[in-house]
Regions:
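Alpha/beta-hydrolase fold catalytic core
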Residues: 1-22, 44-46, 83, 164-168, ...
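Conserved HGGG/HGGXW glycine-rich cap/lid loop of the alpha/beta-hydrolase fold
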Residues: 7-60
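Active-site loop/oxyanion-hole signature of alpha/beta-hydrolase fold enzymes
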Residues: 37-40, 49-89, 93, 244
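Flexible "cap/lid" loop of the alpha/beta hydrolase fold
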Residues: 96-104, 109-138
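Conserved alpha/beta-hydrolase catalytic His-Asp/Glu region
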Residues: 122-125, 139-191
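Short beta-strand/loop motif that positions the catalytic acidic residue
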Residues: 192, 198-200, 204
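Conserved alpha/beta-hydrolase "acid-adjacent" motif
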Residues: 205-211
Length: 257
């Protein structure tokens, strides 16, 4: 199994395909295996690297750094694999590390996709207030109701079960996640001059599309994609649309043939 040593911990990754590199960073309810739709679709034309964050999937977190180590871990993976410049696709929790790394090392990121996330972004007071109020309304939902939209839950009970089964392999969950999130502002992200695509699921109850769109408008040079009939996990709920539109955007931004 492919591991990279990072201090006392080991970071697991899966790498398939040949071509321009795409790094996938999962959310708190996922791990490398959650990206199976993207791995199979994109490996025919790209090198796809799905990374387990420390404490998730097959990665350990001996130092118990949690989020505090995510950005350095990403740099460690890129260095170990000799990846000078990559496209990053990050969902939910993964977006925090991706955004912070992009601001810190913009020369290493050719395109950034922030899917179903505002994690790690300093929000204006009005948006922050609405997000805080929203969090109270979602407290009573089941985990599946939080991460998958009603369209998918009703139509795909087997795939919905698979989502939770994949998450069961994580040592860490949303309640036990340690560390401090490194935040950056939408202004700083825009000033990095890295192309950014914000992806929103139309049924996302955690990061509603209106709020994601509002933050996208504050991020200079960024683009916005909304995916219908998808909740907080658009990459999992509507993979065909996600794979096509996100890949086409990355290919355009990075001038892949």
């Amino acid at each position: 199994m492919p591991y990279i040593n990072q201090g006392a911990s080991r970071l697991y990754y899966e790498k398939q395909g040949d071509g321009p590199p795409i790094v996938l960073l999962h959310g708190v309810g996922g791990n490398h295996a959650s990206w199976f739709h993207q791995m199979v679709a994109w490996r025919e034309k790209a090198t796809v690297i799905a990374v387990d964050a420390r404490g998730f999937g097959n990665s350990s977190d001996v130092e118990e750094l949690g989020r505090s180590g995510f950005v350095d871990d990403l740099e460690c993976v890129l260095d170990a694999l000799s990846l000078a410049r990559v496209a990053i696709v990050a969902q939910s929790m993964g977006g925090g590390a991706a955004a912070a790394f992009t601001v810190r090392s913009p020369e290493r990121v050719g395109a950034l996709v922030l899917a179903d996330t505002l994690v790690g972004l300093d929000l204006p007071d009005d948006i922050a207030a609405r997000m805080k109020a929203l969090a109270k309304t979602t407290d009573g939902l089941t985990q599946l109701q939080r991460v998958l939209g009603p369209t998918f839950l009703n139509a795909q009970p087997v795939q919905s079960y698979l989502y939770t089964a994949l998450a069961s392999f994580n040592d860490t969950n949303v309640k036990t996640l340690r560390g401090v999130q490194q935040n950056v502002s939408p202004t700083a992200l825009g000033a990095s001059n890295v192309p950014v695509l914000f992806v929103a699921g139309a049924e996302d109850v955690l990061f509603p599309p209106d709020e994601i769109h509002a933050v996208q408008k504050l991020t200079a040079g960024s683009d916005y994609l909304e995916i219908a009939a998808a909740g907080h996990s658009a990459y999992f709920e509507q993979p065909a649309i996600f794979n096509r539109d996100v890949y086409d955007w990355m290919a355009h931004q990075m001038q892949w043939s």
